[in-house]
């Protein structure tokens, strides 16, 4: 494709979604199978995730206008990594169950909030990179990579769980972890790897003929 900045950004979005999109459904599975949480709590936590996305969608426009796409994307990576590390550490018995569920809910709300912000910020970046008169093709191209990353994230998670490749339980420093927690740690590592691809995002490192206004720089 002739539009190299858009191609690079689309590949970055694919990798980021591949690393990050499995976390939210994995939380529900972890709570049911790993923490043996009551059904009503699991449904409530899933509602909290939806609330985070709705809240993020509502506030993301103002946040992007104030801070710019660059800072929002950096905040997304930091939040994704810290949230997955927190979920990795939040095991059975680390605190009373009620507080454990509240903490997981808060982490998931923050994660979902930033996921919505990431979607809006990425769309802004994609529309800026699209050449005039070719925005529909650019949108299709970008969305193809975007949704492919999301689908493959859940597919790979399913294959890993189904294959039994991960130890069901393991210990570190006297603390026991499950294979669900191992996946959260894996997600965190993959998000950090995806951060290395920020070098191809023009909002982070502008180059060529793409000049960023206040919406993208936050200035």
Question: What is each PLM-predicted segment?
Answer:
Residues 117-131:
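Intracellular juxtamembrane helix-capping segments at the cytosolic ends
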Residues 56-69, 161:
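Helix-to-loop junctions at the C-terminal end of transmembrane segments
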Residues 2-27, 109:
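Pair of pore-lining "gating" transmembrane helices in MFS-fold secondary transporters
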Residues 65-80:
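Cytoplasmic membrane-interface "Motif A"-like loop-to-helix N-cap segments
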Residues 152-176:
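Transmembrane alpha-helix termini and helix-breaking/packing motifs in multi-pass membrane transporters
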Residues 97-118:
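Hydrophobic core of transmembrane alpha-helices in multi-pass small-molecule transporters
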Residues 78-98:
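C-terminal ends and interior cores of transmembrane alpha-helices
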């Amino acid at each position: 494709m002739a539009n190299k900045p858009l191609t690079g950004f689309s590949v970055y979005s694919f990798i980021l979604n591949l690393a990050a999109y499995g976390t939210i459904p994995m939380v529900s599975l972890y709570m049911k199978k790993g923490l043996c949480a009551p059904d009503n709590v699991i449904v409530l936590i899933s509602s909290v995730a939806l609330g985070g996305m709705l809240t993020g969608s509502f506030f993301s426009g103002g946040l992007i206008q104030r801070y710019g796409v660059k800072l929002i994307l950096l905040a997304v990576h930091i939040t994704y990594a810290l949230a997955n590390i927190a979920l990795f550490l939040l095991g059975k018995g680390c605190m009373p169950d009620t507080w454990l569920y509240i903490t997981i809910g808060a982490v998931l709300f923050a994660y979902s909030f930033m996921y919505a912000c990431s979607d809006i910020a990425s769309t802004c970046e994609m529309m800026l990179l699209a050449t005039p008169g070719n925005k529909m093709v650019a949108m299709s191209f970008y969305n193809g990579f975007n949704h492919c990353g999301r689908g493959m994230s859940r597919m790979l998670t399913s294959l890993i769980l189904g294959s039994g490749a991960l130890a069901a339980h393991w210990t570190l420093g006297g603390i026991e972890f499950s294979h669900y927690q191992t996946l959260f740690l894996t997600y965190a590592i993959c998000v950090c790897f995806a951060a290395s691809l920020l070098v191809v995002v023009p909002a982070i490192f502008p180059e060529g003929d793409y000049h960023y206004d206040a919406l993208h720089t936050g200035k």
